[in-house]
Amino acid sequence: MDIKLRKIDKYIWEIPKEGKMNVPVRIYASDKLIEKMKEDRTLIQARNVSMLPKIVKHMVVMPDGHEGYGPPIGGVGAFSLDNPPVIPGFVGFDINCGVRLLRTNLTIDEIKDRLNLLVNEIFRNVPAGVGEGGKLKLSIDELNKVLDYGVNWAIDNGFGWEEDRNRIESHGYLDFADSDAVSNTAKQRGKDQLGTIGSGNHFLEIQVVDQIYDEEIAKAFGIYEKNQVTVLIHTGSRGLGHQVASDYLRLFEKKYKYDVPDRELIYAPYDSKDAQNYLKAMAAAANFAWANRQLITYWVRKSFEKVLRKNIESIGLEIVYDLAHNIAKFEEHTIDGKKQKLIVYRKGATRAFPPGHKELWGEYKKYGQPVIIPGSMGTASYLLVGQPKAMELSFGSSAHGAGRQLSRVKAKKLYSYSEVIRKLREMGIIVKSTTKTGVLEEIPEAYKDIDEVVRVTHELGISKIVARFRPVAVIKG
């Protein structure tokens, strides 16, 4: 299908509004990244979304955009609240897949002799892989509380510190969640998966600070020096979130016969009971994901204490920030000079509110919302902060990762498992995985250049680079 694409600035591209499109499509990318997007259906999928009713301003594709289910991954779309479409495919199957960054008071020299032991201990405590269950087996009644209260349930039950909830987007809890909107099938899948990583591109990394770009902001977030040890957790709502998406997609597919450019964009009208139930179930799955990352944090803290034989106060392991990158949120944005309440979908995109935004607090309000962009296995990750330009360009959103460029099938054919492990060892990275496939599918070559994605994000003024981290150990499914 022919896409009319015009370049309107160094890193800004547009598919002009025409035909059935209700708004133009804006793509933020370098020449190199836009060429990658042309290789799959990213641009076609973004144009399809622009044809949906009630969409405002423009459909956005972030620099890490690539083909997904329905809308592209790296897609951001905002809709007026005048009975807009509620689109499960625009949140995706891994509801509140997100990342959490922890900082320590340690340098790599203090732990390098025990790094292998530490990785093994975390691997024991935090299961990874498809369908893997965790240490916690919840009754359905208890699981309902997790779904309704998110991170609050975890902290109230001793799995965290009081200050943890103040270092999480939305305080780790969406108040419109309702466990009754989540099917029993989804609950059965999720009841023993709290505190687990899962498979695919999910991981837990022990990292070190590689470079600090803004010392004042880094210090405010607890990042003080090069070679300081950090931990990055990347996971979501596991089988429960996947089932929520499947349940509602199936229901909407059967019940609503709207003329959509792609059946994967099936939706229910916001004012319908079905749409409201999906939003309640999505919020419940998001709460589950925040509780999941909280339980993993708890076990990481316990593992560090045991292996290093130090108390947690001297180790640190405070949360720098935790954010969602697959979610729908109700937010206020300025459209044509007027403030409007909108529903904003971010699918493979990170909220990036600027300094002073009313939804931020403490040091985040002063410096901007932290944006954590993980790289692929073996490559750097970045900490940035949201900037004012994000509100104008991308509904307060930023990139979320490197963005896949090779399918899992193709990635597996490039190297043998032993070759990948050897290459990573040569880079000084320990890898512990449940399966060989999990490593082969996630080789660095399967992803776009993280440095390029971050550079474009920074130069556009969407987010500002604060620090870069490099992995020393990776745990995968």
Curated annotation (Swiss-Prot):
Biological-process GO terms, alphabetical: tRNA processing
Active site: H400
UniProt binding sites for GMP: 201-205, 325-326, 374-377, 381, 400-403, 476
Similarity comment: family membership: Belongs to the RtcB family.
Organism name: Nanoarchaeum equitans (strain Kin4-M)
Protein name, UniProt field: tRNA-splicing ligase RtcB
Cleaved signal peptide residues: none
Binding site for Mn(2+) 1: D94, C97, H202
Keyword Iron: no
Assembly: Monomer.
InterPro entries on file: RtcB, RtcB-like_sf
Swiss-Prot/TrEMBL catalytic activity: a 3'-end 3'-phospho-ribonucleotide-RNA + a 5'-end dephospho-ribonucleoside-RNA + GTP = a ribonucleotidyl-ribonucleotide-RNA + GMP + diphosphate; a 3'-end 2',3'-cyclophospho-ribonucleotide-RNA + a 5'-end dephospho-ribonucleoside-RNA + GTP + H2O = a ribonucleotidyl-ribonucleotide-RNA + GMP + diphosphate + H(+)
More info: Ligation proceeds through 3 nucleotidyl transfer steps, with 2',3'-cyclic phosphate termini being hydrolyzed to 3'-P termini in a step that precedes 3'-P activation with GMP. In the first nucleotidyl transfer step, RtcB reacts with GTP to form a covalent RtcB-histidine-GMP intermediate with release of PPi; in the second step, the GMP moiety is transferred to the RNA 3'-P; in the third step, the 5'-OH from the opposite RNA strand attacks the activated 3'-P to form a 3',5'-phosphodiester bond and release GMP.
Top class in the EC scheme: ligase
UniProt cofactor note: Binds 2 manganese ions per subunit.
